[in-house]
C-alpha cells in the first residue's frame, strides 16, 4: 500500500512548496508579475525555460544528511498576496531566528490506498501534504516521482485458491501475481524560484495530474483504463540531493464483471454419472470469481478426485473460468436441476448471477441385423422420435432412396419411444458384402449405436445349397423309383396267384 502514500506525498509537497516560496511561479512560461489562479493542472510534459530541457537532480554527497523528526517552535501564518504568486510568512521571531527553525518531516495522506476502476473508465486519487511550512532555504528544491508498477497474472491457476486464502492475491512476488518492470510516469520538481518542472510522459494524455496550491492537494487520473494499468502507483518525495523522504503506494485495481455465465450439462446414457460445467466468461482480475453449485436447490460439493476448475486469460477480453462437477447416477436418479451460482467481488463491490441446466438421459436402444428374401433387415426397439436409420455398405453411406424405414409400434418399456424396421436390398454381385445399420440423431459418437453383418454371395456359398437340392431330388427319385418297382412286383405276384387259382 505504498503507492497511495507516495502519490499523496508528492502532491502535497508540491503544493506546500508553492505556498512557501516568496515569489512562487506555478508555470515556467508564466511571468512572476502575472496573477495566477490557485489551481494548476497539466498533463505530464516537458516544461522548460528558454528551451532548456529538464535538468537532472544532483545525487546526494556522502557527507550530507537530512535532519528529521524535529518540531517547530514558532507559529506561522501564511498569507497569499493578491496580484503576485508570492506568500508572506509572518513569524513571531526575527529572520535570524527563522533561519534556525527546525520543522517536522512532511507526511502525505491519500484519500485511498486502493482505487477500483472498471475497464475503459477513469481512475482517480487525491493526496494531501501534511507538514509545517519550512523556510525556502531549507526546502528550496524537491522532486516528486510518480512511478507505475504493473502487476501481471500467471496463465495458470494451480495456486489461485491457496493464494486467495493466504491473502496473497494481488501481492507482487506471490505465486499468483508478479510485477513487471516499473515505469516512471512523471517527475515533478520545484526549483528555488518556485517554478515547477515535469518530465515528458511516454503515454500522451493517458495520465492527467493536477495541483491545488490552496489546499496543498495533488490529484492523479488514469484515463481509459485497460488490463495493463493493473498495478500500483508509487509516489516518492525526494530532497534536493535526490534522497527519498516519503514513499506512498496506491493500488490500481482494474475491474471487470463477468460478461456471461453458462452451465453446460451434456446428455448422458442411462447408468452414467451426471456432469456439468460452469463457464464464467470475461472478468477481471483472475481470482475475483467464486463459484458454488446447487442440485435441485441443495448445495452440491465438487469432488477433488474428479472435479475442479481452471482459467485462462484472453488478451483484450479478460479471464475465463471453467468449473466442473459430477453428480449422481442417471440409471437411478431422475435428471436433476443443476445450478451454478457465481459471485464476483472486488473491494466492497459484489455482483452475483446464476445459470441452470437439466441434462438429458438417453437409454440404450436394441437393434439386430439379418438377411431375408434378398434384403438386409434391421430391427430397432426403443428409440426417441428424432432417431433415424442410415445404411452403410462397405462403410460407405447409401442414399436414403435405396432403403426404407417404417415405424412398427411403440416401445413397451420406455415412454415416448418407438420401434423401427428398416431394410435395404442386398447386392447380388457374387462377393462378400458388409452391411451396417447405424442409428443417427444421438448426441454421442456417430458409431455409438450400430450393427454390422456380412452377406456372402460368392459361388462357393451359392454351390452348397444347389448340391443339397440336387442330392435331395435324386434321393427322392430313387425312393420313388424303388417304391414303384416294389408296387409293380407286388401287383405282379398277386396277379400270378390269381391265375393259378
UniProtKB/Swiss-Prot annotation:
Residues 28-465 are virion surface. It is found in: Secreted; Host cell membrane. Glycans are attached at residues 46, 91, 100, 120, 212, 354, 400, 429. Residues 258-356 form the Ig-like domain. It holds the Pfam family Marek_A. One of its GO terms (cellular component) is host cell plasma membrane. Residues 493-501 are cytoplasmic. Residues 1-27 form the signal peptide. Its main location: secreted. Keywords: Glycoprotein, Host cell membrane, Host membrane, Host-virus interaction, Immunoglobulin domain, Membrane, Secreted, Signal, Transmembrane, Transmembrane helix. It comes from the Viruses. Residues 62-72 have a biased composition (Low complexity). The chain crosses the membrane at residues 466-492. It is a single-pass membrane protein. Residues 53-86 are annotated as: Disordered. InterPro entries: GA_GC (IPR001038), Ig-like_dom (IPR007110), Ig-like_dom_sf (IPR036179), Marek_A (IPR001654). Belongs to the herpesviridae glycoprotein C family. May play an immunoevasive role in the pathogenesis of Marek's disease. It is a candidate for causing the early-stage immunosuppression that occurs after MDHV infection. This is Envelope glycoprotein C homolog. The gene is gC.
